[in-house]
Regions:
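Beta-rich carbohydrate-recognition and catalytic domains
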Residues: 1-85, 91-172
Length: 172
């Protein structure tokens, strides 16, 4: 077993909230492993997280980790008012030669009254996000747990879960 079955990462040492969930991992074209996680302790409530953790490893045992705390990083913008930054995931953008990080956001100021899916590129060393996040899509109802895959023909498919009313369910 990996690391002789011993824990590799302790969430209370890598996150501001001392807890993580929704891990997503992939291997990059450079051979490194990249992981993103929600920085959250569930017992504090569903609207209790304000960021994510970006991680990178050569061997899946030793990890570099960096928190992205939205109220601090995006002070003075709508992103400073997030009540949740949920289920971040990554995909490598071959054209840009960068990792795209995408996630759901909800704010408490009315500017994002339901979970919308946003995205931003990670910086070169996968320690932060570049620029302000942009809307990936707006389903006009809560959308969470997004996943993007590329098929063998180079076509991208987006899967997500909806949370609102009659539209509730998984979509492609």
């Amino acid at each position: 077993p990996l690391n002789d079955g011993n824990p590799i990462i302790s969430s209370d040492t890598i996150s501001l909230k001392k807890g993580v969930r929704d891990p997503h991992i992939l291997r990059g074209p450079d051979g490194y492993f990249y992981m993103v996680v929600t920085d959250m302790r569930s017992w504090e409530g569903w609207s209790s997280n304000r960021g994510m953790v970006l991680m990178r490893s050569k061997d899946m045992v030793t990890w570099e980790h960096h928190t992205v705390h939205f109220p601090e990083k995006y002070a003075g913008t709508m992103f400073a008012n997030v009540t949740r930054v949920w289920a971040p995931q990554t995909i490598y953008d071959k054209k840009a030669k960068k990792f795209m990080v995408y996630f759901s956001i909800l704010t408490d100021d009315g500017k994002c009254p339901y979970d919308k899916v946003y995205w931003a590129y990670a910086n070169e060393d996968f320690s932060d996000l570049e620029g302000e996040p942009k809307v990936l899509f707006d389903f006009h109802s809560a959308a969470i747990d997004t996943d993007i895959i590329e098929d063998e023909d180079g076509m991208y498919h987006v899967f997500f879960k909806t949370e609102g009313g009659r539209k509730k369910g998984y979509r492609q």
